[in-house]
C-alpha cells in the first residue's frame, strides 16, 4: 500500500488532536472538516510551519509543497547532479489558492537518489529537488490530496 493511500485510514479525530497538541493550534483543529487529510500539502497550506516565527510567503509555499511535473529536457546529463526542465502547475493565491497553468521550471536531479530518469517521465519534487518517479496511482493521489488541501485552505480562509 502506498503511503498516500494510507491517509484515508487516519481518523479525523487523530488529525485534529495532532494539530491541537503538537502544533498548538486548537482553534484550527476545531474547524477542520471531515475530509481533511494529513498530507504534506495540508501542512503547507492549512497547518502552517512548525517553527512559529517562520513566515511562509506564497512563493515559498509553492516550493515547499510536493509538486509533480513532466520532464521536458535533461541538462548536464553526465554530471552527478543534473538539471531537469519540467512542466508543472505552480501554486498561486489571488483571493483563493489555486494551481496555475503549466509552466517550465528548472529543478535539481541527484542521480544517486534517483538513478534512472528519461524525458517524458512524471516525477515529484520538493524545494526544486527531484524526489521520485511517479506511477499513475501515485500521481493521482498526489493531485487528489493537493487539491483537497487547497479546497480546505480556501474554505478556512472565508
How should these model regions be labeled?
Residues 59-76:
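Structural detector for short beta-strands of small beta-barrel domains
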Residues 1-62:
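Anionic-ligand-binding alpha/beta catalytic cores of soluble enzymes and soluble regulatory domains
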Residues 90-108:
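Short, basic/aromatic beta-hairpin or loop at an interaction surface
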